UniProtKB/Swiss-Prot annotation:
The lineage of its organism: Bacteria, Pseudomonadati, Chlamydiota, Chlamydiia, Chlamydiales. This is Sulfur-rich protein. Keywords: Membrane, Transmembrane, Transmembrane helix. One of its GO terms (cellular component) is outer membrane. Disulfide bonds: none annotated. It is a multi-pass membrane protein.
Amino acid sequence: MSSNLHPVGGTGTGAAAPESVLNIVEEIAASGSVTAGLQAITSSPGMVNLLIGWAKTKFIQPIRESKLFQSRACQITLLVLGILLVVAGLACMFIFHSQLGANAFWLIIPAAIGLIKLLVTSLCFDEACTSEKLMVFQKWAGVLEDQLDDGILNNSNKIFGHVKTEGNTSRATTPVLNDGRGTPVLSPLVSKIARV
């Protein structure tokens, strides 16, 4: 029914992905710091791909192979719900445009839609997690976490949205690299986007 090769997880044996996930959970529990463990997991695309591969073999493939999911009615319903979600999110952005500056709670709308889109493409469309997608995910998850922890966008994140710089911790809005002489240089990703 399922293959031993995980296209997203990148492991060659069927039992390696669940054992690796269990080892990660045990290491986090042994370290006593859930925050440090989650930061370690969310900072590596390889680890995220491993977790996505495990989730695909345990949850996504059985759902895809079910008769209900393969029915035309279910597929049309999911397509309509997805379109309604995107349209509702965009409509809320335009309707509450003036509120975005006054009330940061409305920033949850694009963050939630972006997270859903990234999860759907990674889990259902057989796309691997790249460093760029992981950085975008961390930014959006950072906005959600920052808004939901105390209701204020004040960079009080404990898990998502922080990168270590020379002496402080800041939100990873635009990745800036150092050229060794103290002059900030844009990352290759931002440079590539700027050229387009």
